[in-house]
Amino acid sequence: NIARWTEGILSWEKEFPWSEMETDNEQRRLRELKKIAAVNLKKTSGGHTSNNGEIYRAAVDHHVIIKEQIDLYKADFIICCGTEYAFMDVCYKDREVDWKMTSRGIWYFRDGKSVVISFSHPEARVKEAYLFYALTDAVKEIMRCEEFEEQL
């Protein structure tokens, strides 16, 4: 899912039919994943499911490293995959942010040149197409709003 998301986000002006997105996954992974950085808030391995309390405590315990990583990457997009509360308390604890909601209910805010989006985990038990289109539609709306605001 992350490779699909990357392609959809970085090519947000393009329309992607699902028949195209559900195939060629190995080539997509090779092509797209080198364009991104993934940051785990919990810095130690665990099982295939996550405990939000453990993730939160781990993020707070490693807040210096996490903040340094985020600052180093200077990301265009930061997708919080179910971890926005821990992320906010680690990276934006003493800052006011202006959360906005897309027309389809995806929360986000702008931090300088970065867009921070609160979203689901890529392995959520939801159809992959639902996750892909929910996220890429949100990015399209955000980018179109940003383009409009820049023209004013």
Task: List where the protein language model places each region.
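A polyanion-binding, active-site-adjacent surface
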Residues: 1-73, 77, 83-85
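C-terminal capping/extension of enzyme domains
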Residues: 53-67, 86-152
